[in-house]
Amino acid sequence: MSADNENTPPKGPRFNLNVEDAKARAQEAMRKSEFILSRAYGLLREPKKEWEQIKAEDTTVPHILIGYVAPLAAIPPVCDLIGSALFNRLLTIEPGEALVRAVITWVVSIGLVYFLGVLVNVLADTFDADRNELNAQKIAAYSLTPSFLSGVFSLWPPLWWISLFALAAMVYIMHRGLPVLMKAPEDRALSYAASVTIAAAVAGIVLFSLASCVT
């Protein structure tokens, strides 16, 4: 066998399969990105109609957390990591430590969404709504969509305050979804959403404070 043949990269089904797999994964990522943006737009533009569609979707809690929340929850820590590097904030900490913090933030964010869903379900009786674990997790996951997407502003730290508008959007979206998914009375939906948001904010502060102690 000649030296040229030895240096020739393999041209077989395995190589082609890897290329096809990469293309398939890229296409799937694009579809998922389009779905997330479409859902966020629908929840802000026509929340009642979008919540009705969400209610009809046949899914599971793990699928919501892994398939929808996990990719979204990665946006804030990844953008913060990039923003820190661009603005030289990484000089104050080791890159490895910054990466660990980003991963912990991501995991805690997913856990916080699940906790929020549990809270929505637990408080249902207080606000004359119906308990439903799956619908409560849908409320938590999709209401937090604007908050996760606002993480892109971490790319330029001086714009962090814009993320506060995402909190207002979260309350608005949740308030419109509670009557649809949890059958909450219209006149109690806003106080329901506000109570859940405040409790989740407190829990988030505690969880992220504990997470920061780990690193």
Give the location of each predicted region.
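Selected alpha-helical membrane-embedding segments in polytopic membrane proteins
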Residues: 2, 28-128
